[in-house]
């Protein structure tokens, strides 16, 4: 029997809505990365963009375990000598773009190549509860009820 390979016409993409309020960041990112790659589908083909379109709301209310909110640092370099910079997760979450914490966590769980970049375009993250994708009729994925460890209280 030959190995099944999906054809572009057979790929069916759904829209998934996830509420990140109170959900542990790493567990959320792992589930989202799996959905973006399409590994939850029985027709998964590694070299094709099979994943769903994922919308994450309330990204500013995501939780972290331990002291990661203060200890975890996001580094970047300005390109100038001695230009290494960093911000803690707390500074990013309280800043102008708190959704970047979730985007970066998911981005680091997706492969770093052309396919990975294509899959990341299917992710939309919003800091608040509002999103402009009602016309796509996304189905809600309740990450909190999947496992008791997926949530933390403040």
From Swiss-Prot:
GO biological process: negative regulation of translation; translation
Entry annotated with the keyword Ribonucleoprotein: yes
Keyword set, alphabetical order: Ribonucleoprotein, Ribosomal protein
One annotated Gene Ontology cellular component of this protein: cytosolic large ribosomal subunit
CDD domains noted in UniProt: Ribosomal_L13
Gene Ontology molecular function terms on file: mRNA binding; structural constituent of ribosome
Region (Disordered): 132-154
InterPro entries noted in UniProt: Ribosomal_uL13, Ribosomal_uL13_bac-type, Ribosomal_uL13_sf
Domain of life: Bacteria
SUPFAM superfamilies according to UniProt: Ribosomal protein L13 (SSF52161)
Oligomer status and interactors: Part of the 50S ribosomal subunit.
Role noted for this protein: This protein is one of the early assembly proteins of the 50S ribosomal subunit, although it is not seen to bind rRNA by itself. It is important during the early stages of 50S assembly.
Assigned protein family: Belongs to the universal ribosomal protein uL13 family.
Protein name as catalogued: Large ribosomal subunit protein uL13
This protein's encoding gene: rplM
């Amino acid at each position: 029997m030959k190995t099944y390979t999906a054809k572009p016409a057979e790929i069916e993409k759904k829209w998934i809505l996830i509420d990140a309020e109170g959900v542990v960041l790493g567990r959320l990112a792992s589930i989202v990365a799996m959905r973006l790659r399409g590994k939850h589908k029985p027709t998964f083909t590694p070299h094709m963009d099979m994943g769903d379109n994922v919308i994450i709301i309330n990204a500013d209310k995501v939780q972290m375990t331990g002291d990661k909110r203060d200890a975890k640092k996001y580094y970047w370099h300005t390109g100038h000598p001695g230009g290494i910079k960093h911000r803690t997760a707390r500074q990013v979450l309280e800043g102008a773009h708190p959704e970047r914490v979730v985007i970066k966590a998911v981005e680091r769980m997706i492969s770093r190549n052309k396919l990975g970049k294509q899959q990341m375009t299917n992710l939309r993250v919003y800091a608040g509860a509002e999103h402009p994708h009602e016309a796509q009729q996304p189905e809600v994925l309740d990450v909190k009820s999947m496992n008791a460890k997926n949530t933390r209280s403040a």
